[in-house]
Amino acid sequence: MSGNSEGLLESSGGGVGGSVEEEKDMKMEETGEGAGSGGNRWPRPETLALLRIRSEMDKAFRDSTLKAPLWEEISRKMMELGYKRSSKKCKEKFENVYKYHKRTKEGRTGKSEGKTYRFFEELEAFETLSSYQPEPESQPAKSSAVITNAPATSSLIPWISSSNPSTEKSSSPLKHHHQVSVQPITTNPTFLAKQPSSTTPFPFYSSNNTTTVSQPPISNDLMNNVSSLNLFSSSTSSSTASDEEEDHHQVKSSRKKRKYWKGLFTKLTKELMEKQEKMQKRFLETLEYREKERISREEAWRVQEIGRINREHETLIHERSNAAAKDAAIISFLHKISGGQPQQPQQHNHKPSQRKQYQSDHSITFESKEPRAVLLDTTIKMGNYDNNHSVSPSSSRWPKTEVEALIRIRKNLEANYQENGTKGPLWEEISAGMRRLGYNRSAKRCKEKWENINKYFKKVKESNKKRPLDSKTCPYFHQLEALYNERNKSGAMPLPLPLMVTPQRQLLLSQETQTEFETDQREKVGDKEDEEEGESEEDEYDEEEEGEGDNETSEFEIVLNKTSSPMDINNNLFT
């Protein structure tokens, strides 16, 4: 197909259209259409440049048998103009444009003539220039004709010469000059040139509006060329249209593909972003949910701990109340069983002949009478707790019953106190007696309490005031007065105990006082404060008791001992 087009274009003459090419070049320069693109589509300026270069090299194409170097030259010139196209692309583009031009001229596109193809005028001029061949210089006779201005409706039909130059030479030329008016030939509408609005059929002008051109003779070869051209045009019109439609379809498909891929990637990107946002939101919600669960678990654990502590506290209070109720019931039962007041110990005769017998009898009598005293004093003590509710078993103050028990035990041991020697074992024995009665007091505390109540007794006695029985200041005045009166009446000093009895008693007492050593060490700190506060509260007994309570750091507790028989006492004494 391209070979037929090249043969047709190479067989056409072309050397007389210089002025037309110059006008076309000027027109393209005035429009300002320049650099092309390197894509598949050929812009209009680039196509015009290709047609101009091809028309300039038309003579070279007709004279040369090798067309490839010529197309390389066209590609180079296109490169100089700024259009990067290969020789193959230039050749294909020119063939396609020429094919479509032929189809347009035949009127098979279904559109009005002159408006169907944008390069119609350029290709028509190129075809017109190619249809004339200059006459050889060696030919003496020239056939010329003076062409006059024809009406605007008339058109010039260029004759395409045969491809064989010898046929032209053999034809008989017209040897005379004459004026002719060329009428349009309708037998071959393919070669009808589009006429401008002027009356001149060609763009060739002279000074007198007449042009002398060579008129070739009409021969049979002309009809053959016309028929071959018609066949070429009909065979290539369909391929040109298909190529153009294919190019247009490719452009549309490429655009659709780009649009499709662009939309696809945009959609994928949006989906990815949405998924990431959902994952981030889910992650934050999970963290918040876990934090709330942790806080709720901590709150629940805290509530459980508080409930457990409250239950333990209530259980402890209940157990203590039950224990207190049991102790009160036991004490009341013992009080009912014991009956009256404990008997006072009998007075001992302090005779030298009865000293040893007195010691043993005194021990047995004291121990035998102590259980009853324990029951009575304990009952009185617990009754005082129930009535007043002011003194608890863990208080450090000396209740009245405890002080009375101290005075009673001290009175029972008055004979031993009058003896010469150290008084430490005596107070240890008093402390042991207090412990048997249920009062946990050390020997040192018992001694200090005894000295304090005696000091108050002396001060009250020196005031020479008559004390009533229910006096609140020094309520033990009458008991102490009876003790001192009895001491004054007896007058005789008791003899010291045998030496063999003292170590045994000291051994018994040392076992009982061993556990009280640490308590005495803690109580040394408040000893000095006891004396200072005790002196400032001389008038009122309540103040004196409060001062002693602040100084005393030890606690007392109720100890319910079972009744000991005299035999047990003797066994403990001599072990």
From Swiss-Prot:
Keyword Electron transport: no
Region listing for Disordered, in residue ranges: 1-44, 157-181, 232-256, 339-364, 513-575
GO cellular component, one term: nucleus
Biased composition (Acidic residues): 528-555
Alphabetically ordered keywords of this record: DNA-binding, Nucleus, Repeat, Transcription, Transcription regulation
GO molecular function: DNA binding; DNA-binding transcription factor activity
Record-linked InterPro entries: Myb_DNA-bind_4 (IPR044822), SANT/Myb (IPR001005)
Protein name per Swiss-Prot or TrEMBL: Trihelix transcription factor GT-2
Domain of life: Eukaryota
Biased composition, class Low complexity, residue ranges: 1-11, 161-172, 232-241
Gene: GT-2
Functional description taken from the UniProt entry: Probable transcription factor that binds specific DNA sequence.
SMART domains attached to this UniProt entry: SANT (SM00717)
Comp. bias intervals (Polar residues): 355-364, 561-575
Localization, UniProt: Nucleus
Residues of the Myb-like domain: 40-98, 390-454
Coiled-coil ranges (or none): none
